[in-house]
Amino acid sequence: MSTAIVVFSGGQDSTTCLIQALTHYDHVHCITFDYGQRHNQEIEVAKSVALDLGATSHKVMDVGLLNELAVSSLTRDNIPVSHELQENGLPNSFVPGRNILFLTLAGIYAYQLGAESVITGVCETDFSGYPDCRDEFVKSINQSLVLGMDRKLKIDTPLMWLNKAETWALADKYGKLDYVRNQTLTCYNGVIGDGCGDCPSCDLRKNGLDDYLANKESVMADLESKI
């Protein structure tokens, strides 16, 4: 029996990963991290979506310590989300160490459940400039987890080389485009579905959807060549 852990936020990317994983694995467990995020409504959305789609189980883990250490527009209500990059070249929505912590804890959870894979929706093609979404980082932490726990584990990144339009196409391939569009929460301001239409996350999501809807055949062909 095959088992996977999906790092799950209830957003477009992780929901698309969950939809795909449910067709590939016998047991799919979701893990969501509560780090005091600005858009904490995502935790309730994640609970609802995981239950609705039929995940085997869903664990919500309190990692509030991250909020104390990582100052970001996603962890502080008094820091507006900016479209501009900071002096260090990163967006102010970057939460330092977030994926280091999330993937480490998901790897430990996989050890506990005997899961062979941890699935995360990080992407290097249309990412927001976060260094912990890069393929190089994921491969590095995957190797560290294998060495540190002396157990085979694969961190799977099905969206790594897909752009946002292709991610929409992947949801559509499984007949879930409307579900992902209407039920997920990607917006930094906590608006479900198409979002606030103003934050960087909404811009990325909308541009990808518009591209896919305008060029379905070619985008789907590009997707098929990558998966």
UniProtKB/Swiss-Prot annotation:
Its cofactor is Zn(2+). InterPro entries: QueC, Rossmann-like_a/b/a_fold. Keywords: ATP-binding, Ligase, Metal-binding, Nucleotide-binding, Queuosine biosynthesis, Zinc. The keyword ATP-binding applies. It comes from the Bacteria. Its EC number is 6.3.4.20. GO terms for molecular function: ATP binding; ligase activity, forming carbon-nitrogen bonds; zinc ion binding. It holds the Pfam family QueC. It catalyses: 7-carboxy-7-deazaguanine + NH4(+) + ATP = 7-cyano-7-deazaguanine + ADP + phosphate + H2O + H(+). Binds 1 zinc ion per subunit. Pathway: Purine metabolism; 7-cyano-7-deazaguanine biosynthesis. ATP binds at residues 8-18. One of its GO terms (biological process) is queuosine biosynthetic process. Zn(2+) binds at residues 187, 196, 199, 202. Belongs to the QueC family. Catalyzes the ATP-dependent conversion of 7-carboxy-7-deazaguanine (CDG) to 7-cyano-7-deazaguanine (preQ(0)). NCBIfam families: 7-cyano-7-deazaguanine synthase QueC (TIGR00364), PRK11106.1 (NF008317). HAMAP family: QueC. This is 7-cyano-7-deazaguanine synthase.
